[in-house]
Amino acid sequence: DDPTGAHRILVLEGAFEEGIGFDGITTAEAGHDAFLPLMIAAAQTARMKLGTNVAIAFPRSPMVTAQMAWDLAHFSGGRFTLGLGTQVKGHNERRYSTPWPSAPGPRMREYLLCLKAIFASFQHPGKPTYFEGEFYRFTMMAPFFNPGPILHPQVPLYVSAVGPYMARLSGELCDGLRLHPISTFRHTRDVIVPAVAAGAAKSGRDACGFDLVGAPFLATGRTDADVEQARNSVRKQIAFYASTRSYHGVLAHHGWEDTGLELHALSVAGKWTEMPALITDDMLEEWAVVATYDRLADAVRAKAEGLFRTVTLTLLDEARRDVDLMRDTLRRLHQD
């Protein structure tokens, strides 16, 4: 086994990030499983929250997800947050061998309700709470298979969202919402926030404590020249995401439908190098925080304050060479 592999790196990363002031660390389900690294990180950290950002829901049954989440909640001392996403049809069918029988929203709704029923049954073995829906059912919980109660049974639930349906669903049933980076600041303010509030009102909840997690792109560097180079890199990322038709609702909100169609056509033709030029400076400002390191904290606050409760930031490469730089940025972000 390679001791310098991805999971070994995550162990070191978690302890390092906690030490310089990050409030939490999250894992994406990309090349590796989203859950296993967090068990490792939980053993190496004491304070920071640990979450999936996000785990793909449908390839796993609610019971499989619930068991992993329950163990992580217990082992981490209540620091685990469960973030779930649907992915798109092609990935479910062609990569995960998972059927896509209908629109994902109603299925995610049942998935969350089923999870809640399973968690309640774990915590109260003598009084199981069952669930039966169109897509998911949980109607059996023998004592032998019940992990039993834990000290922190309220596992915070998050879903990823780009459109209003999932945003309403999160407001109704979840503790938070993890925005996709394709969500612009204006689309979030105009579409996502009202949808979350509507979902919270439907369930009689107060949305004030809801954790709306933003994930803006960062175009940053030590000098203005570094920032300009980072802007070009971010344009490539934005162009890639904006070429996906599933995300064109965000572009339509800004009147950028034609840009989305052109980006999609270029991607189909394999003309990837031509795509970033379609992302204008005005577009970039709606998707990204652009600033040198010394102005980054103020720039993030200017874009995020009053909109996001939590902001996901990628650990800056410079931080490994200049820890004080990252620590100071985080300190200023934490200031009231």
Regions found by a protein language model. Name each.
Residues 1-336:
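Active-site-adjacent structural elements that line small-molecule/cofactor binding pockets in enzymes
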